[in-house]
């Protein structure tokens, strides 16, 4: 055979294709490989390389296996279609190669769309877990919670995948068979009229053994779908009073599901025998399955709903409480509050010394003005915590001083600044919550740069923050350039990194990978990188944990802790969530989404200097985290491995508490009839936000208080409730944070017969007090603005103390100063310049600034608090009765009638 030589300078087609492939790889693949190289070094830095390989495997393997299975099914379908058309793949080799690649892509498309890898991975991780691990069991189907969290989602996914493969196989078979038949006929057709339209119909192939086989498999898969649908009835919603299986589902729906399953299997048998018409009779079973439950519900259940649905409502109540962790961990206490009971200031000094006078928003604005030092320093967040300072248990506010070069665009424009020089924040501001300077500013225990620590028991040895809430760019440390540390007068103090954070970056390969990943060629060209230089990435705490354990939900509010050694360590809460808890109501959780199961399973720590990251399991009985522990054994540690100085600062997370409070306000009703009728529905208490009467729901508040039956104050997370559409207090939900009590919850249930003022009512009394209202109006008109914090509700002894700090700030400068303190106990208001003055009046019972409760809207001026003389039991009881009726009428807004009760009281005490 004669060979044809290519002219000089011309390349063969194969060479051109090879060069094009190399070019495409350089354009699209090199950056991915560079990213993988950097990520591998990051995982090695954390000591979690095995975890990364496991995640890579778990992410690829399920889709790869599903792709292979789908490809085999599609290839067989394609081959049988060609055989039906009278040809075969062996006769068309180029077509065979192209079609094989196309089928492989189609198989991947089906697998990637149908397979959720984490559903498969969680199912694999749950194998071998004890069935009773979660402590909840479905008595209708006799299934543990793990079946609904892991098994049912996996089986449902598998069913959907099989049905998708069957549908694509049938379509492929028809298209390929008819396409090749048409190709063979086209050369013999003289015009389009000779092509019979019936040729394109499917009926001609119904006798194909392949189509019958595919239909049989599809009908069996459909039977499996209805079988699994029995369990999915546990998610049926029946109005606002029931989720899960109800009377109709159990007595009509479940038996009919077996009828439909039998019909599907019978149809599969008829199709296998070629009796397609008989298989179509399956539709009758579907009609019965659709209509019968609705008829029974309308004609029999609805007229007798509460009596028939009672056991199912009870199941729903307990399932929902269990799903949100309020069935096992909540202790409900009847709190017999006495609103007018005096407060012993001396006996409650540890508690009163920790009353939070600084609202976090006001504190943030003030600290930003007096402690930011430079424009590029920001205080991103203020957190509430507790420390033992010089022997005293103190509640404090703490905020880190982080560096954010986005505040200085000019400095950021030079690549050297963010990468080598401005690498870290510096120091924190820490203040006790209840101490105020004469100027109305917070007393600071830690301030300035370098840090000035004013408490002997606190120390700060590593104030640098390389990892934080606003750190967003990679940096290089231990380089030839010194780093900016903190400002000092007109100059700056520099430093060199002395820790072990980051990974080596000095080699040519790593520098090239970093340059490609970041799109910054200067990384490859710079002379500042030394043999010991390291690169820090994923420095934002939340992003770091999402990279490390993205299968968990992470709280959006990390908080900083000062360890005994003086290091700064971030703590952040991680959650396991699901929408698969049967019989349970779902709620929307901020930053997470809609869930009906949540646990605070993990608490993570990130060293602000080194980036050292650990995850500790705090819910070992949670089946989801147990499955992840089996999958990633190197990633998690038990909670008792957390260092003691960090464990002291673990707290109950606000995100979880909000979700539980939202559920509890309805699901505190355990009686099915009360629940059905919503007889005792609660709301989150509201509070006044401005002098004009604006209101919004209160947010959970960290406080230091003493629970009934406890000997000393402790760190608590608290939220008050009111009856639906009312403002008087009906209960307080409290989560404990200290020591072995961490995670325990207490609900103080108040008497429905005793009117206890809520935050909104206290706010209304404050706004309508003539003296206070006059001051607020005056301050809002003199180039200043009044700010109000959230009114605190604190249980003290057998009564409640309400605290409302009032701040003032200039309209052109946001630096709030604490101007006044309002304390309220029962009917008394104390309005003072300082907290110490208010406590002195509370202790002495002084009346100069203590006013009587005046009905909101009343024009009566405040009077000295009246005390009923003890001149006889009958008269005293009468005073109590009138006072009780006054409170009831005041809570309902019936001020005219309430005024008459006050007049009756005045007549009795004169």
Swiss-Prot record:
Similarity-based family: Belongs to the UPF0182 family.
Q: Check the record and name the Pfam families matching this protein.
A: UPF0182
Highest taxon, organism lineage: Bacteria
List, alphabetically, the InterPro entries matched: UPF0182 (IPR005372)
> Which residues are listed as membrane-spanning?
17-37, 56-76, 101-121, 157-177, 210-229, 252-272, 276-296
A Gene Ontology term for the protein's cellular component: plasma membrane
Q: Where in the cell is it found?
A: Cell membrane
- Protein species of origin: Solibacter usitatus (strain Ellin6076)
Name used for this protein in its record = UPF0182 protein Acid_6445
Give the UniProt keywords, A-Z.
Cell membrane, Membrane, Transmembrane, Transmembrane helix
Topology relative to the membrane: Multi-pass membrane protein
